[in-house]
Swiss-Prot record:
Belongs to the peroxin-22 family. The chain crosses the membrane at residues 9-27. The keyword Magnesium does not apply. Its main location: membrane. It is found in: Peroxisome membrane. Involved in peroxisome biogenesis. GO terms for cellular component: peroxisomal membrane. This is Peroxisome assembly protein 22. It comes from Candida glabrata (strain ATCC 2001 / BCRC 20586 / JCM 3761 / NBRC 0622 / NRRL Y-65 / CBS 138) (Yeast). Pfam families: Peroxin-22. Gene3D superfamilies: Peroxisome assembly protein 22. It is a single-pass membrane protein.
Amino acid sequence: MSKRRKNQGYLAIIAAVSIGAAAYLWWRNHSEDDSVSKFNQQDDGTAQDNQIKEKPAIKLGKKRLHRSLCVIISNKLSNLVELDWDEILQEDIVFLILPSVNDFQNSNDIKTDTHKIINCDTELGLWACVRTLKKNELLVCADDIKVPDDIGRYCDKISQIKSSQQLMNYLDET
């Protein structure tokens, strides 16, 4: 008989805690709805549209870029003479330089945001950088380096670039 009373006591405590938690969650959600509706009213009392504002687009060239880019610089892509590095490096773009690229011609012209140009010592380190950065789009010359199968999990889109001119055109278009 005393065992049954102990179980009833535990059940009463569990029920009280559950009711308290449910009441707290209801109160919190109800108070957030009130604050949101008060926030969405203009001074004249009319309600505003509940629209999610899009992040401002990144300006690059003449058009806008909404994505973050990771560009792997290989031997075919290392001659980027006409690129405006000061403008490009202000955007959400990271350049990873392959270990086989010895003469990256524009490395002396870059004055700001040099942390966005990463010289990789090994291909394993290069792919570790790509996985860690998790950029929306990866630009790579597949003729110079083999892309691992799992990289698609870390980048939304993988684009094949054949030459440095095509890369410059791509950066100007986006």
